[in-house]
Amino acid sequence: LADPTAATAAEDTQRNAQGAAVLAGRPVVSVAHDADEQARNLVGWRQTYDQLAAGRFVGTLTEMPLDTMKVFRETTSHTLRQACEVRGDAYWFGIPVRGQGDMRIDAQWVDANAFALRPGNVEFELLTPAQFSIYGVVVRGDVLRHYAASVEHKDFDACVPHAPIVRASPVRIERLCALLARQLDVAREDVEGRHGGESDRASAGTRLASLAEAERCGSQADIQADIQAEVLAALFDACAGDGRDANPACGGGVEGDARVMAESGARRRWIVDQAREYVLAHRARAVGVPELCEQLLVSRRTLQYCFQDVLGMAPATYLRALRLNGARRDLCTQAGSVQDVAAAWGFWHLSQFSADYRRMFGMRPSEALRAS
């Protein structure tokens, strides 16, 4: 029988504050002028906010609902005591924004080198300071367990700590926050576009048009899969520890490194070659690292080490360069329009494709097409 709590968690990732279904992958921004209203805006939670300092409250919530998770950033103006509980089979990762004050979870301080983690159906208490911002990710439990087994090739319980506070290296926390900010910035820019000047509105309209085009081409699922894979990888990296006490069972520490390095040179080259061939065979979509791990039956850490050893770069970096070079060759032979070539190589955001292409080759795709 299907787990009803998993279904509830999955449904909650795609509903807004009013309970209405929203398009997965489309950012949503809400503003509250009451602490209880702010608490209600977070769908999929049981929670109560008590305002502990005088003054008019203002809270904002920027969220990105996805198929298997919800990513959000919450900002609150006043000191709050929050009684919280995520519903269903899901896990909440709470990463405070640096420089905005420390919060407490169940009376324990969460400092700059740590983040909070709580499973669903477990009540906890947060005490947050004034002018506070926090990134949150709520992920379905079945998704985390599948990722641990199929991509990390590790036991989920060994990878994800059970304590409410998880220590992590500053580099890993900064990388995770930068990733979440990059995804949520789209929401902020779209809101500014709706309320800003003509150029802002035109920019927002272009982004929405690109999204609509992606949906018509059936690529939105691939885009969401890429985002979710990036977030999952960053979360598991952060859970690996602060570098001193990383858990070998989740690929961290000296023992984990030794297992990965035991792969022979020929085996590493074979893994890289197989990854390249698989990406080229599925060039019309952006194949991610998790998919490669499942296809090649290797862990993400092993794949990372093989690419670093053979090519001197991360797998995602090389695979993007591989697709960009393929697009460059097609443009130089006038194999189609810029949009056609981009789509043929799995680039569905034209503006991002143009920026990546120019960064790689020093010219825009349209310039390469005209010069051919």
Regions found by a protein language model. Give the residues of each.
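Alpha-helical bundle regulatory/interaction domains
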Residues: 2-56, 103-283, 288-290, 294-300, ...
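Long amphipathic N-terminal alpha/beta scaffold segment
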Residues: 48-84
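Short, conserved glycine- and acidic-residue-centered signature motifs
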Residues: 86, 268, 320
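Glycine- and acidic-residue-biased ligand/ion/polar-headgroup-sensing regions
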Residues: 67-69, 76-104, 141
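Short, basic-rich loop-to-helix N-cap that marks the start of a DNA-contacting helix
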Residues: 317
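Short hydrophobic/aromatic patch on the recognition helix
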Residues: 303-307, 352-353, 357
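Alpha-helical DNA-recognition elements
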Residues: 309-310, 321, 359-360
